[in-house]
Amino acid sequence: MILLTGATGYVGAALRAALEQQQSPLRLAGRSAEHQEECAWVHYDLSDEGAPAGALLADVSCVIHCAGVAHRYASDSDFRRINVEGTVRLAKAAVAAGVPHFVYVSSMNVVPVDAQSAQERAEHYPEPSEAYAASKWQAERALTECFANNDCLLTIIRPGLVYDAELTANLKTMERFLRWWPLLFPAIGRRSMLARADLVDLLVSCARGNAGAPTGEGVIAATDGECYDAQRISRALSVTTKWGVMPRWLCRMGCRVLDWLRGYPAGASWQGLSSSHWYGPAPSISGWQPRCVLESRSVNGGPASQ
């Protein structure tokens, strides 16, 4: 039995669909049973300070923990209460219930851009200054301690920026902007990315013991290995022919306007667009290999193979 949290989120919903299609024994944990009629469901709220009910983890062979707060401007206390404390409570309950394997979906933002490897344990990196990344870093460290002296295996997965035919967050904003804007973005910034379908395949492989800690890989940097700058991303997301490439000065000015319209700190949009978050070629991972690239994400309604 696989226990999945965050089944209504961007990654969790796709993972749930894949597991159901494969007829894998599945239990969902969440705050609401809405749209969960076809699956076993147990009420669970990460913000509850009490220990999870025993029924949550009964007969579970693997926990895949996708739930959490990801909003950029959530409060520091919410990040701490849900992403760190809630995750640790669930992990301790899994250990107490004798669950063999715990898979934690973290974030590549845990890794500094100048790190030599993106697959070191969190303790080898400085704590990030950004609140969301810091909460993931803190959760990773706490989980490592939680699973240090017992038989439950821990797999930490750090995905790059996740995409699919259906986009979310900043990629969705960029796609909407490019529907009417006639120019590509300049070649600034670098990103590691991963198709949602590939991430789902990796999570399924981990749950089945074919990848992750069961094969000796406790921390996985999950990317397709490609280096995506803003120009490449904007070209891939464009559905109309562009006239050329936007000058950097114009792009910077547009970012200032966006900061003002959305109430962001001055310079936030430009920093997000121009910063480097590329972590090198895709690592060799047992039982999994990425198949998709951003440029062909809309072919047949989703990402296509390289």
Language model features with spans:
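NAD(P)H-binding glycine-rich loop region in Rossmannoid oxidoreductase-like domains
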Residues: Y44-E85, R89, A93, V110
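Conserved Rossmann-fold NAD(P)-dependent oxidoreductase catalytic core, especially the SDR/UDP-sugar
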Residues: R89-A131
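Active-site Tyr-X1-5-Lys
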Residues: E127-T155
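Amphipathic terminal alpha-helices
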Residues: Y279-Q306
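Mid/C-terminal beta-alpha module of Rossmann-like enzyme folds, strongest
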Residues: S205, G209-P265, S298-S305
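A hydrophobic C-terminal alpha-helical subdomain
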Residues: W249-W288
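N-terminal Rossmann NAD(P)H-binding glycine-rich loop of SDR-like oxidoreductase domains
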Residues: I2-Q22
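A conserved pocket-lining segment of Rossmann-fold NAD(P)-dependent short-chain dehydrogenase/reductase
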Residues: E175-D198, L202-C206, A221
